[in-house]
Structures are given as structure tokens and as C-alpha cells.
């Protein structure tokens, strides 16, 4: 099984393997097999459109966790210029599961904050698999208050299974760190745009998710608990995760229908990992447009709009 493809994508993987084999044959024997390659490429595109046009909620949850999916630093590289990363919470340490710093978007200074997972084993461990400890959220809070002080918009990228539940995190008051961020973000006198780029897991996501505009990528998720966690509570087995995912309404389209999400950003065919540069361009377009819209509000109007937005949840 090709690790770059999930199990429901294997028919696509098989076609891609055939295309690569034909390319190698053509290179070795100088044969003109372009027509056959074009036919298989068209077939692969049609098959991909068919599969991705009918994804279940559980399949979308798995897409949100795809090991090749672009992470925050990938989007920073492809969307912004002059990124200068800032470190530390000034209380305990620097948490690598949260990255943040100042950059430019359309030549405007902005503060970027996001979860960061890892690719290889060592980086995954260093980033704690994208699960922040309290010092990560306190670093984020420090950067957000800095952004308000220097009148910079805040752009957050959400991609976490959740806040780290370890004993050391609890000893340093994980719940307080999350709650404090919610309080601070609700009152910040600067525009905040949050974009869910992968997993939006519970309070770990919400701690950098209070905003004026919430975006979700097409194959991202946002929920109070993982489907496996929900299934383990309700049915006492994680095998019911597909049923839980469907019942919870974790997908971008479902949340858009509920009024939680403002904008669903389309992904390239097959997911953002198939064309990270194109995915970044789509996000950049939305961020530029939304920033221009939010800059039209003065501070009082911006805070009133944010408050009304939060109070509308669940109505």
C-alpha cells in the first residue's frame, strides 16, 4: 500500500503506479506512449473526482490527518514574506507545538500563530505531535497581545488533535492557559482571522480560534472530541468512529450550515497535499480579502461584531 494514499484512495494509487511504470518504459526504450499515459491520467482525474465527490465524514477526518498534508510552516513559506519567528512564553519555556511570529501579507505586517506537527519521528516528538502544553498557549497569548500593541492583524492556523493531556501540562495549569487565551482573544482590539487547515481538536484548537472570521479548508475537521474518543464514550469501542464522525457534524460543510464557519476554502483535487502551492494560493486569496473587509471596522465595531458572532453559536 502506498503510504501517500489512504485506503479509499488505493484505486487512484494503482493508476498512478501504472502511469509511472509507463513513463519508465518510455524513458528506457524511447517509445512513444504519450497517448496511453494521457488516457490513464484522464482516467485518474475522473476517478479522483468520483471518490472525493462522495467522501464520508470519517474519510474527511482521515484526510485532515493525512501525513503529507501541509502544516502551518508550509503555508507560512508559501503565503507570507519576511517571516521572523518569535519564541518563548517568558514564564517557563518555548513550546515547539506552537509556532508564531511576524510576517508580511501584501506588504502589511501581520502576526501569525499556528499549531505545528512534525514529519519525521524526531520532529514529531519535538513538536509533541502538534499538541501544545500550557507554555505554547501562553506564548501564543504573548504574541497576540504584542500584535494588539503594534496594531497588527492576527492570523491563526489551527491543526491539532487537542491540547496535551499529560501530567506535566496539568501541573502547569493547562485549562487556565486555554481559558485565559479565550478571554484575551475575545477583547483584542485588532482583527483576528482563524483558519482550520487540518484537525481542529477541542479546546486545544479553540485556544487560538476565537476570531472575527473563521475559515476551514475543505477536508479539515473541527470538533469538541475526536470521533474515536466520542465512540469510546458512547459505544465503548473506537471501532464506531465512522458513526461518531457522521453524528458529530465535524466537517467544514456541516459547520458552515450551522453558522459556525464563515468560509469553506476549496482544496486542490485530491486534497491540499496533492498541490500545496495551489492550496496556499487559495488561502492567501481569502486572507487578503477578509483582512480588507475587517479593516473597515473601528475597534468598537470590531469587538461588538466579534461578541455578536460568539453569542450566535447554538441559536
Swiss-Prot record:
Annotated catalysed reactions: N(6)-carboxybiotinyl-L-lysyl-[protein] + acetyl-CoA = N(6)-biotinyl-L-lysyl-[protein] + malonyl-CoA
Keyword DNA-binding among UniProt keywords: no
Any Gene Ontology CC annotation: acetyl-CoA carboxylase complex
Top-rank EC class of the record's enzyme: transferase
Compartments where found: Cytoplasm
One Gene Ontology biological process: fatty acid biosynthetic process
Protein EC: 2.1.3.15
A single MF term (Gene Ontology): carboxyl- or carbamoyltransferase activity
Entry keyword set: ATP-binding, Cytoplasm, Fatty acid biosynthesis, Fatty acid metabolism, Lipid biosynthesis, Lipid metabolism, Nucleotide-binding, Transferase
CoA carboxyltransferase C-terminal domain: residues covered: 40-293
PROSITE patterns: COA_CT_CTER
Recorded metabolic or biological pathway in which this protein acts: Lipid metabolism; malonyl-CoA biosynthesis; malonyl-CoA from acetyl-CoA: step 1/1
Pfam families associated with the record: ACCA (PF03255)
InterPro entries per record: Acetyl_CoA_COase_a_su, ClpP/crotonase-like_dom_sf, COA_CT_C
Family: Belongs to the AccA family.
Record note on quaternary structure: Acetyl-CoA carboxylase is a heterohexamer composed of biotin carboxyl carrier protein (AccB), biotin carboxylase (AccC) and two subunits each of ACCase subunit alpha (AccA) and ACCase subunit beta (AccD).
General function of this protein: Component of the acetyl coenzyme A carboxylase (ACC) complex. First, biotin carboxylase catalyzes the carboxylation of biotin on its carrier protein (BCCP) and then the CO(2) group is transferred by the carboxyltransferase to acetyl-CoA to form malonyl-CoA.
Protein name per the record: Acetyl-coenzyme A carboxylase carboxyl transferase subunit alpha
Protein source organism: Pseudomonas syringae pv. tomato (strain ATCC BAA-871 / DC3000)
Primary gene name: accA
Amino acid at each position: 500500500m502506498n503510504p501517500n494514499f489512504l485506503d479509499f484512495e488505493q484505486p487512484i494509487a494503482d493508476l498512478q503506479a501504472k502511469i509511472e511504470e509507463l513513463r519508465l518504459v518510455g524513458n528506457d526504450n524511447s517509445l512513444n506512449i504519450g497517448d496511453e499515459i494521457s488516457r490513464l491520467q484522464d482516467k485518474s482525474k475522473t476517478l479522483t473526482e468520483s471518490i472525493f465527490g462522495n467522501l464520508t465524514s470519517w474519510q474527511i477526518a482521515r484526510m485532515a490527518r493525512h501525513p503529507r498534508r501541509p502544516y502551518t510552516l508550509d503555508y507560512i513559506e508559501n503565503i507570507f514574506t519576511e517571516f521572523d519567528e518569535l519564541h518563548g512564553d517568558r514564564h517557563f519555556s518555548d513550546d515547539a507545538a506552537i509556532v508564531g511570529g511576524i510576517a508580511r501579507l501584501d506588504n502589511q505586517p501581520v502576526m501569525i500563530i499556528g499549531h505545528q506537527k512534525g514529519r519525521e519521528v524526531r520532529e514529531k516528538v519535538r513538536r509533541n505531535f502538534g499538541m501544545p502544553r500550557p507554555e505554547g498557549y501562553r506564548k501564543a497569548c504573548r504574541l497576540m497581545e504584542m500584535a494588539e500593541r503594534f496594531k497588527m492583524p492576527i492570523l491563526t492556523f489551527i491543526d491539532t488533535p487537542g491540547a496535551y493531556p499529560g501530567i506535566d501540562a496539568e501541573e502547569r495549569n493547562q485549562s487556565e492557559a486555554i481559558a485565559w487565551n479565550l478571554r484575551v482573544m475575545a477583547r483584542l482590539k485588532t482583527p483576528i482571522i482563524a483558519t482550520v487547515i487540518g484537525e481542529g481538536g477541542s479546546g486545544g484548537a479553540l485556544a487560538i480560534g476565537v476570531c472575527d472570521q473563521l475559515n476551514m479548508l475543505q477536508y479539515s475537521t473541527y470538533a469538541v472530541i475526536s470521533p474515536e474518543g466520542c465512540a469510546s464514550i458512547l459505544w465503548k469501542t473506537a471501532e464506531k468512529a465512522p458513526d461518531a464522525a457522521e453524528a458529530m457534524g465535524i466537517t467544514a460543510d456541516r459547520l458552515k450550515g450551522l453558522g459556525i464557519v464563515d468560509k469553506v476554502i476549496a482544496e486542490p483535487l485530491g486534497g491540499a497535499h496533492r498541490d500545496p502551492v495551489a492550496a496556499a494560493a487559495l488561502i492567501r486569496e481569502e486572507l487578503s480579502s477578509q483582512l480588507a473587509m475587517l479593516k473597515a471596522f473601528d475597534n468598537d465595531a470590531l469587538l461588538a461584531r466579534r461578541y455578536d458572532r460568539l453569542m450566535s453559536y447554538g441559536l
